């Protein structure tokens, strides 16, 4: 009888443990876009979203910018990364590798914000489709969300109408 009770307790524990571990894997991760021409408040909207996200997130929130400008309004809980500090990251592939390395080094990252994505490395409207595909892959593999701001009208961004992307404006 004791062995039976022990087995039931262990099975219950393992079942509960498995459901806790699979929660993060079952959550649907996504690439979210904020679009619009220069001067339409995309950066401020991204900062507000990051500040809200850090209050409700169970993981770490990262905010990637080109420069140190306007980072003072970010909540102290948001990890700000300025790409000026990494001048050798010049290509889209290097930038994607940087993201993979960041996620591999910190499995607690829940959300990554990338402000002014067209100013990062050599990302342009010509190759943003490939970049967003890479983000979707990273998002799915690591169950994290991306929020990116693009300094262009929604209509000028190729392949934006995919189920993998959510346009917020």
What do these predicted ranges mean?
Residues 31-101, 157-159:
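Conserved P-loop
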Residues 5, 71-72, 105-109:
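Short hydrophobic/aromatic-rich motifs at helix boundaries and adjacent loops
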Residues 1-29:
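Short, Lys/Arg-enriched N-terminal segments with co-localized hydrophobic residues
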């Amino acid at each position: 009888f004791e062995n039976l009770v022990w087995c039931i307790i262990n099975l219950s524990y393992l079942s509960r443990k498995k459901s806790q571990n699979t929660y993060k894997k079952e959550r649907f991760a996504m690439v979210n876009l904020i679009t619009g021409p220069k001067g339409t408040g995309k950066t401020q909207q991204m900062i507000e979203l990051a500040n809200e996200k850090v209050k409700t997130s169970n993981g770490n929130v990262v905010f990637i910018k080109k420069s140190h400008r306007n980072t003072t309004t970010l909540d102290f809980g948001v990890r700000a990364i300025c790409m000026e500090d990494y001048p050798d990251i010049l290509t889209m592939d290097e930038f994607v590798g940087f993201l993979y390395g960041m996620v591999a080094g910190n499995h607690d990252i829940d959300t990554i914000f990338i402000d002014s994505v067209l100013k990062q490395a050599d990302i342009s409207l010509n190759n943003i489709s490939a970049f967003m595909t890479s983000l979707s892959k990273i998002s799915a593999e690591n169950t994290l969300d991306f929020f990116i701001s693009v300094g262009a009208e929604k209509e000028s961004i190729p392949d934006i109408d995919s189920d993998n992307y959510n346009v917020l404006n």
